[in-house]
Amino acid sequence: MKTNFSIIGCLFFSPLALASQGTLHYSDFINEMYQESGGIRAKALELEAELLRSKQTDLYFMPKISAESKYKSDTTRGDITDSKVTASSLIFSTTIADRFKEKNSRIHGAELSLLKEKENLYKTLVENLIGIKYYNNLEAKAANLEQTAVELYQQIEGRYVSGIAKASDVEQARLLIQKIKTESESINKEIELIKSNIELATGIAFPAQGVYLPDNIIDKINTYTINDKKIYNNLDYKLLSEQADAAKFNAWQQDSLVQVSLVAEERYNNSQRVDKDSWGGIQVAVNLFDYDKKIARQTGIKAYQVLKTKMDFKYKELLAKMKSLQLTINSNEKELQGLVDQSKTTEVILANQKRE
């Protein structure tokens, strides 16, 4: 006995928004899950790395200082030590704007990647908690049916002892109890399997007292309307978009035209400053032709085109999932209605047999 609860996985809005709209009784479990998840820690470290890397762009003008010293032995002049200290600072480049755009895209991509990891865990937890909730309801109904079936069996057995009922009636009543017990055992097995899935996905033990899922979560899912415009809010799609932009801006930096820097150089001979060789000024570098840089730019553009192609494919994939989602919703509604009808039919049968 298995009910499909995969509807949650196909929703294209962020389920994290649900957690922010009210106090949820399972929020502590969610927080613990986030803290214990190795995947989330890895994504958080990736974001920290991008934020550190962004300082290279923000402080592009910071001077670069280097020192160099050479020891020479000359038969006429004796031992000589030539030293040089050079400082340079970039003040303009035709690629600076693209560097900042790439930085922003990479940071946004890392943030989306972290959010996506959290969303996946949240989605998995909610999916399974909904499963537990429905199976618990079924288990409660099965328990009531079993109690009714036992009472019916006792009545039929009493009538059989009195010679009113037949032996076949007793066997049918016993068979009904066994069938209901089998269904109850199947339900309990499904619940334990779902708990195991939660532990596997989250890395933490499922609480013995259970996790309460508010009804408003299911209400929000039931009232969710499918809209293909919401595809653009899908985290996978947005992440591909940021990665594509980062690749594009990086490609545009590979073949820069002009670079202007402040440069100062101090030369020393045996620790004595050499004034005629020491200087400071502005250095302008113009890239007239560099085959390697042109190839690097073209390669970067190809990487951008690959990601754009993946975005188009992801859009079509999500659109197909939305259509499949509607079919899944209709199928699940019919399946659940069938289970409800079966339950009502069983109750009617038991009631009729009691009256008889």
Question: Where do the protein language model's features map onto the residues?
Answer:
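N-terminal signal peptide c-region/cleavage motif recognized by signal peptidases
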Residues: S14-P15
